[in-house]
């Protein structure tokens, strides 16, 4: 049991570390630009290297974890992240920063796959779903902790990368914990046996497609909602931008509450419920004429979608007997792709059909996901009846 807890702690730290790098970048764009006398837009584009690296990492994890071994990958990735964080602190040029962020994104993407693989290997049934949702809560907690460190560092005229260096220290600690931990419960280090066990069916495929569509809808909202609210209600952009703050504030609380709910509810029912709620709330957001409703609706949306990511992983792997790292990586690749390509897809749509139609598409996407979840659950029920006969 002690080893189980240590492995689970490593999986939580993986999410904590990735969030440490991803959630505070917006606060560092201007200080970073000032440090290297660079254009703000050029610096802001570095964030795409983190996201692109994470997507590449999840794709690489699909092939590497079972071949290299989960323990070796964990040690290598978090050692590399710690070294990259140090390179950001001593970076003599913006190129080194860009290289460091790419390495962090890539290794962090692999790390998220490792985290999911650990949980689905070590825990089963309802506790597995609960642990996966706790990972989302860990991500959101880091989204509060590290920006506070950034705020303290910047207000005290410290180096812009102090907060990233602190995340690097956590990565280094994770590497040492991994070195001292037995990973045999995660399937050992041999990949050949696990590779043959990777199971694929409509349920797990729908988990990946559903997460892609869910992230597409969510990040379309986060990208365009402030401009939509500004234009629709003719208010200042700064005021309209509060909708994003309200979303993330509710997401932190929602992730913690979701942990309790999932421990008492089937993951299929939980996911179907939160997607249905998201569909209804976004329908009201895009059609309401009452500005005073928006804050409450956005809080509800953030609360409902707080555990979306790992809930889809838990949902997908519930359709296979023995989930492997490839199953987890597939769903993570789908989610990363949805988040990464959402701005590009929605931008093209906005230029062709207009902002109003783009916002109307959000609840429609959720409706498609709901339909797909219902179909996959019915297929599973039919298969269980046939097996029983």
Over which residues does each language-model region extend?
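Extracytoplasmic gate region of multi-pass secondary transporters
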Residues: 25-26, 202-245, 252-255
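Conserved MFS/SLC helix-loop-helix module at the cytosolic interface between two early adjacent transmembrane helices
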Residues: 56-92
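Helix-to-loop junctions at the C-terminal end of transmembrane segments
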Residues: 57-69, 254-266, 350
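Cytoplasmic helix-loop-helix junction between adjacent transmembrane helices
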Residues: 100-137
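Helix-loop-helix hairpin linking two adjacent transmembrane segments in secondary transporters
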Residues: 131-183
């Amino acid at each position: 049991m002690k080893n189980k807890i240590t492995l689970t702690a490593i999986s939580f730290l993986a999410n904590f570390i990735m969030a440490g790098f991803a959630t505070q970048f917006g606060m560092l764009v201007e200080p970073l630009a000032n440090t290297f006398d660079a254009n703000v837009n050029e610096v802001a584009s570095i964030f795409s290297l983190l996201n692109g690296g994470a997507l590449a990492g999840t794709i690489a994890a699909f092939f590497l974890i079972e071949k290299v071994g989960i323990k070796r990958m964990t040690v290598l990735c978090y050692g590399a992240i710690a070294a990259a964080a140090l390179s950001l602190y001593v970076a003599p040029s913006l190129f080194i920063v860009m290289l460091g962020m790419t390495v962090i994104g890539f290794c962090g993407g692999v790390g998220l796959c490792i985290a999911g693989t650990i949980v689905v290997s070590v825990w089963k049934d309802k506790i597995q779903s609960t642990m996966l949702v706790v990972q989302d809560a860990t991500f959101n907690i880091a989204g509060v902790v590290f920006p506070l460190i950034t705020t303290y560092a910047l207000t005290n005229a410290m180096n812009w990368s102090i907060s990233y260096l602190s995340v690097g220290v956590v990565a280094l600690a994770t590497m040492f914990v991994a070195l001292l931990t037995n990973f045999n419960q995660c399937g050992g280090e041999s990949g050949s046996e696990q590779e043959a066990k990777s199971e694929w069916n409509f349920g797990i495929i729908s988990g990946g497609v559903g997460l892609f569509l869910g992230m597409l809808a969510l990040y379309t909202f986060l990208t365009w909602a402030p401009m939509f609210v500004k234009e629709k209600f003719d208010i200042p952009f700064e005021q309209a931008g509060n909708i994003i703050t309200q979303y993330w504030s509710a997401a932190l609380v929602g992730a913690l509450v979701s942990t309790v709910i999932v421990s008492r509810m089937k993951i299929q029912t939980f996911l179907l419920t939160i997607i249905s709620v998201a569909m209804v709330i976004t329908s009201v957001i895009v059609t309401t004429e009452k500005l005073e409703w928006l804050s409450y609706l956005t809080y509800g949306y953030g609360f409902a979608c707080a555990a979306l990511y790992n809930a889809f992983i838990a949902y997908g792997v519930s359709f296979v007997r023995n989930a492997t790292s490839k199953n987890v990586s597939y769903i993570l690749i789908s989610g990363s792709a949805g988040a990464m390509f959402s701005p590009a897809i929605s931008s093209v749509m906005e230029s062709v059909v207009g902002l109003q139609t783009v916002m109307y598409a959000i609840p429609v996407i959720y409706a498609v996901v709901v339909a797909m979840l219902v179909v996959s659950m019915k297929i599973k029920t039919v298969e269980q009846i046939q097996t029983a006969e």
